[in-house]
From Swiss-Prot:
Belongs to the NrdR family. This is Transcriptional repressor NrdR. Its cofactor is Zn(2+). The keyword Lipoprotein does not apply. It comes from Dehalococcoides mccartyi (strain ATCC BAA-2100 / JCM 16839 / KCTC 5957 / BAV1). It comes from the Bacteria. InterPro entries: ATP-cone_dom, NrdR-like_N, RNR_NrdR-like. The lineage of its organism: Bacteria, Bacillati, Chloroflexota, Dehalococcoidia, Dehalococcoidales. Keywords: ATP-binding, DNA-binding, Metal-binding, Nucleotide-binding, Repressor, Transcription, Transcription regulation, Zinc, Zinc-finger. A zinc finger (unnamed) spans 3-32. Residues 47-137 form the ATP-cone domain. Negatively regulates transcription of bacterial ribonucleotide reductase nrd genes and operons by binding to NrdR-boxes.
Length: 175
């Protein structure tokens, strides 16, 4: 590592600490004596997404986050939920050990997680990802969500449609 002050290539490590996703090292130049900090992070091997038209594009977590944020915009989700979904998807993709993954696999992973997270975000993402051309396709997705609601809704998730309110109970007056 070259010294940022005198550009000498030698330095000694004074302190080394683990940080969130790597190692922080405090260094001292052996020539000028100036101290500086370096960060080392693991850089996974390149992962490419194969698009529908067979183009290959390097996986970009920021692009994934952007799509997730757009789908979850103005939804009452817990702080960090979108980042966690993106991180989980990224980890799963790298754990597959493949150099290339089809964009359809990535889209299906996003759909699966959004369905568990928030139905509205799921429908928003599905409408773009599945390229709906008319309202009947959207209605079909919503109907599937409503019909399979018992297994699909998780604790804390907002309902897609308002729940039916039970008939008010009749109160009898005492005589």
């Amino acid at each position: 590592m070259n010294c940022p002050y005198c550009s000498h290539p030698d330095s000694k490590v004074i302190d080394s600490r683990d940080v969130d996703d790597g190692v922080r090292r405090r260094r001292e130049c052996v020539v000028c004596g100036q101290r500086f900090t370096t960060y080392e992070r693991f850089q996974p091997a390149g992962l490419f997404v194969v698009k529908k038209d067979q183009r290959r594009e390097e996986f970009n977590k920021e692009k994934l986050l952007s799509g997730l944020r757009r789908a979850c915009e103005k939804r009452p989700l817990p702080a960090g939920a979108v980042d966690k979904v993106a991180g989980d998807i990224e980890a799963e993709l790298y754990n597959m050990g493949k150099a290339e993954i089809p964009s359809t696999l990535l889209g299906d992973m996003v759909m699966e997680r959004l369905k568990m997270l928030d139905n509205i975000a799921y429908v928003r993402f599905a409408s773009v990802y599945r390229e709906f051309t008319d309202i009947t396709q959207l209605k079909k997705v919503v109907d599937n969500l409503v019909n399979g609601q018992d297994e699909g809704i998780h604790k804390g998730q907002l309902s897609l449609l308002p729940e039916d309110k039970a008939a008010p109970k009749t109160r009898y007056q005492r005589r």
